[in-house]
Amino acid sequence: MLKEYRTVTEVVGPLMAVEGVEGVKYDELVEIEMQTGELRRGKVLEVNGDKAMVQLFEGSAGINLKNTKVRFLGRPLEIGVSEDMLGRVFDGMGRPKDNGPNIIPEKRLDINGEAINPVARNYPSEFIQTGISAIDGLNTLVRGQKLPVFSGSGLPHKELAAQIARQAKVLNSDSKFAVVFAAIGITFEEAEFFVDEFTKTGAIDRSVLFMNLASDPAIERIATPRMALTTAEYLAYEKGMHVLVIMTDITNYCEALREVSAARKEVPGRRGYPGYLYTDLSTLYERAGRLVGKEGSITQIPILTMPEDDKTHPIPDLTGYITEGQIILSRELYKKGIMPPIDVLPSLSRLKDKGIGKGKTREDHADTMNQLFSAYAQGKQAKELAAILGESALSDVDKAYAKFAEAFENEYVSQGFTTNRTIEETLNLGWKLLKILPRTELKRIRDEYLEKYMPVGEDE
């Protein structure tokens, strides 16, 4: 029998204090009945003796201290999961948002998940093809990896997210591939874009969408990514699927954390974010991976916008510590009309070496990747030199490098948001561009690969 309390003493923002409680536990789900009969939900944030601090999911507007009834349900926040969730759109709390029927759950799972024993983890080693050359060829995504996208305000990260969700697949695998998409604190316009994009391309059939809008309570943003990850864990570890989890925008999630932390009067850390921001983010990112003995896997692509394009801001800074690399979008490339504007030099996939090579992509992948990185870096230096001293001051080799850098940005990096390149097309395009350079400059590629893969014909 659930006890009912009418001892609400204070309401501040999304927080409510209840006195005289017994047997209440941290993170327990709470049901609040308004004097109008309306039901709202919350969770226990803090317990001190017979006092409990409750965090409200739907906001505190209209709560009457005397007539509000509070029931502690004795269980954490859960989501009902089923394979029928594929092809559906839910709000940030897991309720259907597409006018479809309610899901009949196969089971209910705690959204906080369970910690994965490090010994039970399998090392990521299988290539995921996104169809985007700057990722597949140079910053390869591997199954079970967590690879964030660092973007900036106004940059086309939502188009990139939709493209990856639409095109991503595991090569040479019979297992089913699913996408779990969590939109956190986005506008109506962005939500409409994602739903339309998924629907018209057919990608929604293998996807589960969670949409938390900017107008929804900030507290809901803290639950949304956990709803998505719990669904992903169910599909991966119980249904044997390869699941790609895309979360955008992690910055909005961190802002919600800061808002709740301020309401609780906690001592702020850097830039006002709570001191436990690193720990909290790790509870999201560390839910990616592969387990020994399980066919399925969870690969994560969290997307965040860097305030003022600042890589040293606490959110990208701490994210970089936890995740295995980063894909960085460049405002400079965006202004040039290069789409997607991925800046390949500061971008990094720490596990790329594990997912490429013979039997995974192609034997020449590592050599061409190293050569393309080196040539592009030298080409950018040559272009900067030409801007200062004039093109006539460049040697013939420097001119070739400058020409290569221009072609690399316009043909390799820039492909639009609808082109889906296979890994063979990406590698062959790399060879075509390397032909611009004198053969003596290709020092990072083995002679056997030069003979086998270098396009035959007149030098450009």
UniProtKB/Swiss-Prot annotation:
One Pfam family from the record: ATP-synt_VA_C
Organism: Clostridium perfringens (strain 13 / Type A)
Keywords recorded for this protein, A-Z: ATP synthesis, Hydrogen ion transport, Ion transport, Transport
HAMAP family xref list: ATP_synth_B_arch
The protein's name in its UniProt record: V-type ATP synthase beta chain
Gene Ontology annotations of biological process type: proton motive force-driven plasma membrane ATP synthesis
GO molecular function, one term: proton-transporting ATP synthase activity, rotational mechanism
Protein family: Belongs to the ATPase alpha/beta chains family.
